[in-house]
Amino acid sequence: MRNLPFAMLSLLVVVGCQRQGTSSNPSAGNQTSLTEARRGFQTRLARRESAGEPVPAPPRLFVTVHYDSPAGKLAAYRSPLPQDGKKHPAILWITGGDCNTIDDGVWKEAPPENDQTASAFRKAGIIMMFPSLRGGNDNPGFKEGFFGEVDDVLAAADYLARQTAVDPKRIYLGGHSTGGTLVLLAAESSDRFRAVFSFGPADDVAGYGPEYLPFNTSDRRELELRSPGRWLHSIQSPVFVFEGTQQGNLRALQAMARSSSNSLAHFHSVRGATHFSILAPTTKLIAAKILKDTGPASNITFSEEELNRPFAR
């Protein structure tokens, strides 16, 4: 995880600016899905990186589990499963920063202005899972920078769906910053999530620093297949993208909102919030909506008033 520091904001602003990368808007008439575009493509890594760090033992809030992905068995933190015989909603959460690696940052108490733990979900009784990804911790494989990691996220969802206490029809996905970018790509690759919540994603990964891009960035196709702004038409379940108006990837959100014609994609800029302060109140709001989202299809929506209220001055 390695929580994103406030110093990252200068980089985040760059991510949201115009750059020589891939267009947020596919060429006219290009409706190839992300899944189709990825099929048969072999990424070529310029660097083979893995963290080589064991997964820290969690407190009783979580248990360490392993799930099967195309890269091999990967570690994750998962909430203890309720023993009440009922089916419960669950959420996969992808952290920001080094989203391939999990550590004690997912349970340490954090200030409300920078709470990257997404603890509102577990506090509401929602089953949580923080998956590590290929090349993270002491996992097999190498970091691919938003490519093979998409398959890992989908494999983690398959694992969750098999747990006896989890309602397989009420599995949600969320993530922040780099994790927000990855969950958008997952939403563009599968319809298996009831709803997806992406905080502060990039539309085009070309704006990220080299530490997040271990592939040949001069290869345009490598960038295209990792840039969610190009594949918004591929979204197949409700997706909600959030960013604060004060700092962060606001320009990326605005670019995607302008280019998207997909009715399943919703973009919310939250007045007065930053890339970090948006997390605590908005995840609490999402958790409350998940608990009420019990019908045959998701009924989750957001109003600007309820999103902006915690930041009103």
Regions found by a protein language model. Give the residues of each.
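Short beta-strand/loop motif that positions the catalytic acidic residue
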Residues: 235, 241-243
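Short glycine-enriched nucleophile-adjacent loop
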Residues: 180-191
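C-terminal catalytic histidine-bearing segment of alpha/beta-hydrolase fold enzymes
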Residues: 95, 254, 262-313
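Alpha/beta-hydrolase active-site loop
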Residues: 144-164
